[in-house]
Amino acid sequence: MDLTIRTIYKDPARYAGQEVILKGWIRNHRDQKEFGFINLNDGSFFENIQVVYERATTKDFDAVTRLSVGASIEVIGTLVLTPDRSQPFEIKALEVRLIGDSGENYPIQPKRHTREFLREVAHLRPRTNLFSAVFRVRSIAAYAIHKFFQEQDFVYVHTPILTANDGEGAGAMFKVTTLDMNKPPRNEDSSIDYSKDFFGREANLTVTGQLEGEAYAHAFRNIYTFGPTFRAENSNTTTHASEFWMIEPEIAFADLNDNMELIERMVKYVTSYVLEHAKEEMAFFDKFVEKGLLTKLDNLLKSSFKRITHEEAINILLKSNHKFENQPKHGEDLAKEHERYLTEKAFHGPVFVKDWPKDIKAFYMRLNDDQKTVAAVDLLVPGSGELVGGSQREERLDVLLKRMEDMHVPVKDLDWYLDLRRYGGVQTSGFGLGFERYLIYVTGVENIRDVIPFPRTPKNILF
């Protein structure tokens, strides 16, 4: 009977005493004179299964003793329940067949490796416990995001990766060109003549799908995007990467309060789904990565997210008598230490900070009646700070044009965006959730390089 380890863990009693066949990779191997133990993992489940082989009962015993860590094998044996031992069951091997050998220089040996070293062998690191857990949770969380929106009849929109938009201040962009940059065509002023390029104008990798998402919200009402975005920022921090994934919903006929309700429901839904469907992985993170992680996430699910204005947030910080490295100021952004104080000291839970100063926010955010703030919101969570950023969009054409003028946003390039206001425009709201930022929060793994399969960072594109 050809089985997976996951199938056996679901109902070991069903297969007790039966001959089974398993295929997988050796995680650990201990051999002795008359018997030996192999920890086998087949990728279907976080836990390994122990294979016991003996000289008296296992075919080609001596050959089995020479099998290396990392080798792929097929095991034929009997499943035996072992309730009195540390593992609930094991396989008594009748035969162990080598599928693919692994040399002595295999980098992933059964010992502790630094995360820095494992980034250098990113093609092999999912074979470790840590990264097996990380990337299964990544898969489960991604599915949960789609499930959340699909259950509420949101339309999934594939926004373009190649774009003529410059992101309007969202971040430095990667240019895409087919021109020979050693001899590019020039205009009279010596600037590069992009009319000779593939698209006939400058093109970039996208930093956001929001603007295109707004277009589809004006047709389908509720939409979401979930795809890769790119930032050419030369930043080597634990939270920055040049390629990452964003979830960007957009809802029509909706104001900022509707937006905050959607954010809270989505974060709780996805977190609850991960806790339910990745129990072994989450227990591993709680034990070995971030002590108290499960308690933190349980508190998130039970809490009601507080809502305060940016002005109220600054006042709380100023009255706290806490010594901050960066003094909080009205009209300015919140630093990470401010975010953590609000969530961990002031409110002991998640906090929405809304109504931000217009001068530090994007042109498309709706201007409030005070003419000083915009209908923007950030969700702050304990331990991580900002998790989500969003806003109600400016639906009034005249106000939007004035904001674009004040912020020196080229109207000509975004005339199509203005059409959304000219032809049946409505209130829309939306937000952006950096998928990797969420994974950092939910796993406790602190570096963005360790929650992306093949991280892209400055001077690093090995794979």
Swiss-Prot record:
Signal peptide: none
Gene Ontology biological-process annotations: asparaginyl-tRNA aminoacylation
EC number: 6.1.1.22
Pfam families tied to this protein: tRNA-synt_2, tRNA_anti-codon
The reaction(s) this protein catalyses: tRNA(Asn) + L-asparagine + ATP = L-asparaginyl-tRNA(Asn) + AMP + diphosphate + H(+)
Gene Ontology molecular-function annotations: asparagine-tRNA ligase activity; ATP binding; nucleic acid binding
Keyword Ligase: yes
InterPro entries xref list: Aa-tRNA-synt_II, aa-tRNA-synth_II, aa-tRNA-synth_II/BPL/LPL, Asn-tRNA-ligase, Asp/Asn-tRNA-synth_IIb, NA-bd_OB-fold, NA-bd_OB_tRNA
A GO CC term attached to the entry: cytoplasm
Major localisation: cytoplasm
Superkingdom of the organism of origin: Bacteria
Swiss-Prot/TrEMBL keywords: Aminoacyl-tRNA synthetase, ATP-binding, Cytoplasm, Ligase, Nucleotide-binding, Protein biosynthesis
Location relative to the cell: Cytoplasm
Quaternary data: Homodimer.
Protein family according to the UniProt entry: Belongs to the class-II aminoacyl-tRNA synthetase family.
PANTHER family in UniProt: ASPARAGINE--TRNA LIGASE, MITOCHONDRIAL-RELATED, ASPARTYL/LYSYL-TRNA SYNTHETASE
Official protein name in the record: Asparagine--tRNA ligase
Name of the coding gene: asnS
